Amino acid sequence: DKLVMALPAYANDYAVTGGIKGRQIYQSVPDSINGILPSPTWLCYEKVNMYLYDGTDGNRHLFYASDARSTEALLELADELGISQIGFWHFNSVDPQMWDTAAKWQKK
């Protein structure tokens, strides 16, 4: 039997005000920032960076995206679980550094 761990490589953007539905976006940063993107907050249980920002639509948004840091954390989990095969689930929004992180893990 083979077990393969699928790693996320995409982003989600949710308006937390205004009653707007969340949407999956295909990039590593939000496209509708009003001002400067604040520093991320690390969500240890999700192993991903989260940003709260004010959008150009006038709503407050919660945005999170997979990146090299989140990939590294999930690869460490794969090691802990003894999983030696991985795959990525992505929609053209991959942080290029994720590939470097995965390649380093694969060489171990």
Kindly label every feature range from the protein language model:
Residues D95-K108:
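C-terminal helical cap(s) of enzyme catalytic domains, especially alpha/beta-barrels
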Residues L75, W89-F91:
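C-terminal functional modules
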Residues N12, F91-Q97:
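Acidic-and-aromatic substrate-binding clefts and catalytic sites of carbohydrate-active enzymes
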Residues D1-V4, L81-I86:
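Loop/turn elements at helix/coil->beta-strand transitions in domains of secreted/extracellular proteins
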Residues K2-E76, W105-K108:
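Glycan-binding loop/region signatures in secreted carbohydrate-active enzymes
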